[in-house]
């Protein structure tokens, strides 16, 4: 499992993201356990020259956080345009589409996927995990809002205990989970 340090996360400089964001800038200042942006930035620094998929970006703040390590490439997906694609950062590519329809993904380069999709009902998340299993992809999945409602709690509780880590104290107040997906 991933070792995390709350003080280290709290000390991360998030000014680069705050300066580029067009909405919700104050959330980058939030301490771990309230917002997950510092956790995302920290995790992006744990590997280099990989691809990170940000699924459900809305206003782009998750992609900005995940882009902290400039050696990685972030591909950010949203079904509808909500303004994020106006943000310019050299290691972020914005796509207005369902990531499952993107034939350009080089799956062997993808190390981390953030799933933060509406509605948070556990069904969409399950569909996406099934899709990734069909692709035979393995890596780290970050799941947002795992304690938001009964449906998400049920979804989270059905995942294998030995493959998951509840990191809510470092992430978002409504629940953040890490899933080691298809890892042996």
Predicted segments with their positions:
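A short alpha-helical cap/connector motif
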Residues: 1-114, 118-184
């Amino acid at each position: 499992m991933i070792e995390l340090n709350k003080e280290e996360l709290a000390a991360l400089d998030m000014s680069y993201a705050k300066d580029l964001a067009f909405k919700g800038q104050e959330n980058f200042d939030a301490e771990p356990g309230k917002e997950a942006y510092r956790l995302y930035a920290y995790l992006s620094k744990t590997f280099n020259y990989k691809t990170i998929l940000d699924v459900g970006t809305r206003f782009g703040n998750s992609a900005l956080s995940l882009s902290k390590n400039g050696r990685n490439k972030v591909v950010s997906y949203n079904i509808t345009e909500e303004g994020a694609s106006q943000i310019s950062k050299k290691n972020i590519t914005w796509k207005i589409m369902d990531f499952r329809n993107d034939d350009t993904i080089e799956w062997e380069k993808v190390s981390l996927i953030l799933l933060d999709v509406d509605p948070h009902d556990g069904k969409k998340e399950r569909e996406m995990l099934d899709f990734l299993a069909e692709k035979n992809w393995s890596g780290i999945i970050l799941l947002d809002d795992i304690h938001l409602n009964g449906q998400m709690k049920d979804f989270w509780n059905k995942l294998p205990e030995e493959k998951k880590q509840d990191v809510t104290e470092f992430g978002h107040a409504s629940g953040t989970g890490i899933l080691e997906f298809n890892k042996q």
